[in-house]
């Protein structure tokens, strides 16, 4: 049985409905679910280190190209920090998928920084544009339907979200991304920035 961690970190008025819906959907597909409410960096760290290993991690938050936050700004995490937390906590099973339910969670820079910082991350999925909660919910519904019910590859499942809704979801597969010249350039930039040879 698969395990599905839902991180509730946004605080907007529609978030409870989004989380209840995603939780029900994961359970419909036979997954064990765990919902954690995050208010700051320490509670995020605690949630990732004390709850076991997961096939999916679903992050509900406000997001941008640099990181994610909650509405009150008591939580403000860079994508690289999130990748580091995931790596250190050993919370991912093999072939796990990070579902970033936040604006801009599907940008190249987000996946590149996460992959650079944590070799345990296999897939990163998120929207490439700013969306409402209902748009995000529909997109993730279609994605999970295609992944879990139909058994479709994550990248193809994201393509089906676009075809069905015109919502631009993007899935980054570590194995494919590692040969991308833009990813290689970003890695060199980060290596230089952090003095890694």
Question: What is each model feature region?
Answer:
Residues 11-14, 41-43, 63-67, 104-108, ...:
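Short acidic, S/G/P-rich loop/turn micro-motifs used as interaction or catalytic elements
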Residues 48, 53-85:
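A glycine-rich, hydrophobic loop/mini-helix early in the fold
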Residues 33-39, 124-131, 173-177:
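A generic structural motif
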Residues 136-148:
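Short, small-residue alpha-helix embedded
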């Amino acid at each position: 049985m698969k395990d599905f961690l839902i991180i509730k970190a946004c605080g907007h008025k529609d978030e409870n409905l989004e989380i209840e819906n995603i939780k029900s959907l994961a359970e419909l597909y036979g997954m064990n679910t765990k919902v954690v409410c995050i208010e700051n960096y320490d509670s995020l760290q605690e949630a990732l280190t004390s709850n076991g290993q997961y096939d999916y991690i679903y992050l509900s938050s406000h997001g941008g190209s640099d990181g994610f936050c909650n509405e009150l700004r008591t939580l403000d995490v860079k994508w690289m920090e999130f990748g580091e937390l995931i790596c250190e906590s050993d919370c991912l099973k093999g072939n796990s998928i990070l579902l970033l339910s936040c604006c801009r969670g599907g940008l190249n820079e987000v996946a590149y920084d996460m992959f650079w910082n944590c070799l345990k991350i296999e897939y990163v999925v998120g929207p490439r544009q700013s969306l409402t909660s209902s748009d995000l919910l529909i997109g993730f519904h279609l994605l999970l339907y295609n992944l879990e019910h139909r058994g479709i590859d994550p990248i193809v499942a994201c393509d089906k979200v676009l075809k069905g809704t015109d919502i631009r979801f993007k899935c980054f597969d570590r194995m494919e991304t590692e040969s991308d010249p833009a990813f290689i350039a970003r890695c060199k930039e980060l290596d230089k920035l952090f003095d890694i040879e």
